[in-house]
């Protein structure tokens, strides 16, 4: 059995890069956020890979990936609308039906399901800025082929 999360993360990064724009500018997508990054941005990271179905012919795993949306505004301006809009775009691109699943066949995997496990919103009112964050959790059931 092989680790599929790296391929899922790569597929998500590829699908989202230069695909979501706010105010005429593309929202950057990172796995590792650089120190000079400015908001808004999206961070994609792996959470877990658990074997889910046990049968004699194939390995099936449930792979969970999170996408964190980070926006920020001066303390007395802006709001969470921008994070809502970015989350909506993410879900339209990532949470698809079977015809839109990632093609991982060249990596030896087949995507069986894609599920939105939920979106959680946070607001952090700090001295310099107010940060609006959203965590999108996506679960993919993956078959080793």
Located regions from the model:
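Charged, amphipathic alpha-helical segments and their flanking helix caps
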Residues: 1-27, 32, 47-145
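Short, charge-patterned binding micro-sites
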Residues: 35
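A short, hydrophobic beta-strand-centered structural micro-motif
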Residues: 38-49
